[in-house]
């Protein structure tokens, strides 16, 4: 048994990885800021100790896992080096972990977490699968056959991984503090393609993914008949979305997903493709798909009188558009109210006009102050720059949360990657209910 200490344990990936090592029988603890982060709930439920940052947390005999947001000058990292302990970056450590399994990486600018969550749930319907999801959820199942994990392209960290399979959901320009342009992003994915050992499953409508070169087969999925794996005869029902799946032009089977929106059908197709290639029992896969309950912070719903409150991680214009589309398809007779907190000044600056366009698809828009990050907490623009671009939009804060009372028979989307949950929590307290995120 190894004693692991995670520096930045409340990070989504770090939280998941800490849970996996705990499940596999190791002693696990970690440190982070004292401010509430939704990932700490799962850690506490497993009895994993969360400490405030302090050099005294580091003891002889530990293996220290260093979160990617924390520099080598961090007091705990300095202490670990002074004690000559093994200090391993998150992505490097995860790369070692996955080598013990048949691994499936899920990567792409958007849809990674939702697809990884679906993949782990569906695969466990047929084969024992450990998993690491970017919503802070992780599970290490002893004697697992498979390992499903989220692989982020930021700073090319995913190049530390050599998975058996890779699902690539899309390529888009994001993380403008690191990537220069879309071609820079595409080059990172091209490099990742050469790391894959068995096959790549890629979205067929993405021009950049269509240009990939790889040493393994690439199977394209989507809603078009020229895709290797495609959905047809799509029907929206009160139980979700039903569709037929074709593989290489031949009918495979009919599936039902409890989710709505084209992007969720595409996620399901990617997962079905993996199960098909690994010759899993299709009936087990169908049953598991029908029982998928979603992942944390991805269209998580709470009902309050005639309102549906939705907690969603959407923080890029395309993700916002997809979340609004899902709300409209699931609740066609309700108004859509967007409450959005931009995440990082560089992303807000880079996509200012795109944010305005995507948010304008909602019936009403409220905006929060820009949320900075550990790496970047100031910028030249303000939230007023975005408000000025969206007709009828307004600033919302905890002290004026009651403006949402006026929207009867509405879906209120609380979107963002920062601490937007505090506004939903404030609104729920205002209307007399409480909910732990």
UniProtKB/Swiss-Prot annotation:
Gene3D superfamilies assigned: Mur ligase, C-terminal domain, Mur-like, catalytic domain, NAD(P)-binding Rossmann-like Domain
Keyword Cytoplasm: yes
Organism: Staphylococcus haemolyticus (strain JCSC1435)
Gene field: murC
UniProt similarity note: Belongs to the MurCDEF family.
Class in the EC hierarchy, top level: ligase
An example molecular function term from Gene Ontology annotations: UDP-N-acetylmuramate-L-alanine ligase activity
Function of the protein: Cell wall formation.
Domain of life: Bacteria
SUPFAM superfamilies found in the cross-reference section: MurCD N-terminal domain, MurD-like peptide ligases, catalytic domain, MurD-like peptide ligases, peptide-binding domain
A Gene Ontology BP annotation from the UniProt entry: peptidoglycan biosynthetic process
Biochemical pathway: Cell wall biogenesis; peptidoglycan biosynthesis
InterPro entries in alphabetical order: Mur-like_cat_sf, Mur_ligase_C, Mur_ligase_C_dom_sf, Mur_ligase_cen, Mur_ligase_N, MurCDEF_pg_biosynth, UDP-N-AcMur_Ala_ligase_MurC
Localization in the cell: Cytoplasm
Keywords: ATP-binding, Cell cycle, Cell division, Cell shape, Cell wall biogenesis/degradation, Cytoplasm, Ligase, Nucleotide-binding, Peptidoglycan synthesis
Main subcellular localisation: cytoplasm
Protein's name in the database: UDP-N-acetylmuramate--L-alanine ligase
NCBIfam families the UniProt entry points to: murC (TIGR01082)
EC number(s) on file: 6.3.2.8
Entry binding sites for ATP: 108-114
GO cellular-component term (any): cytoplasm
């Amino acid at each position: 048994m190894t004693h692991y200490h995670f520096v930045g344990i409340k990070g989504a990936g770090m939280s998941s990885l800490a849970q996996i090592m705990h499940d596999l029988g190791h002693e696990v603890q970690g440190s982070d800021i004292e401010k509430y982060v939704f990932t700490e709930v799962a850690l506490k439920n497993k009895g994993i100790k969360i400490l405030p940052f302090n050099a005294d947390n580091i003891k002889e005999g530990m293996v220290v896992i260093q979160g990617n947001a924390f520099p080598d000058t961090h007091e705990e990292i300095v202490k670990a080096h002074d004690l000559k302990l093994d200090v391993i970056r998150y992505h490097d450590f995860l790369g070692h972990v996955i080598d013990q399994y048949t691994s499936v990486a899920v990567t792409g600018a958007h849809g990674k977490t939702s697809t990884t969550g679906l993949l782990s749930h569906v695969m466990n319907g047929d084969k024992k699968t450990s998993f690491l999801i970017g919503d802070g959820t992780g599970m290490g199942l002893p004697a697992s056959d498979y390992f499903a994990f989220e692989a982020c392209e930021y700073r090319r960290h995913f190049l530390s991984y050599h998975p058996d399979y890779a699902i690539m959901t899309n390529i888009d320009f994001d993380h403008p503090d690191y990537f220069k342009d879309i071609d820079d992003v595409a080059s990172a994915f091209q490099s990742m393609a050469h790391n894959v050992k068995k096959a790549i499953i890629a979205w067929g409508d993405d021009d950049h993914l269509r240009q990939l070169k790889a040493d393994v087969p690439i199977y394209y999925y989507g809603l078009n008949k020229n895709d290797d794996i495609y959905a047809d005869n799509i029907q929206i029902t009160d139980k979700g979305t039903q569709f037929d799946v074709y593989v290489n032009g031949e009918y495979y089977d009919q599936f039902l997903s409890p989710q709505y929106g084209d992007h969720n059908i595409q996620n399901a197709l990617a997962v079905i493709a993996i199960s098909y290639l690994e010759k899993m029992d299709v009936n087990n896969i169908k049953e598991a798909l029908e029982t998928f309950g979603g992942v944390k912070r991805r269209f998580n719903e709470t009902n309050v009188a005639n309102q549906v409150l939705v907690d969603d991680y959407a923080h890029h214009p395309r993700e916002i558009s997809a979340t609004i589309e899902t709300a409209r398809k699931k609740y066609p007779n309700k108004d859509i109210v967007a409450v959005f907190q931009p995440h990082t000044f560089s992303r807000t600056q880079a996509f200012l006009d795109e944010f305005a366009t995507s948010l304008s698809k909602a019936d009403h828009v409220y905006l929060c102050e820009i949320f900075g990050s550990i790496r970047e907490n100031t910028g030249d623009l303000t939230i007023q720059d975005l408000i000025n671009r969206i007709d009828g939009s307004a600033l919302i804060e905890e002290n004026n949360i009651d403006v949402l009372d006026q929207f009867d028979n509405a879906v209120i989307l609380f979107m963002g990657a920062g601490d937007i949950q505090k506004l939903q929590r404030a609104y729920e307290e205002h209307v007399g209910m409480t909910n732990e995120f």
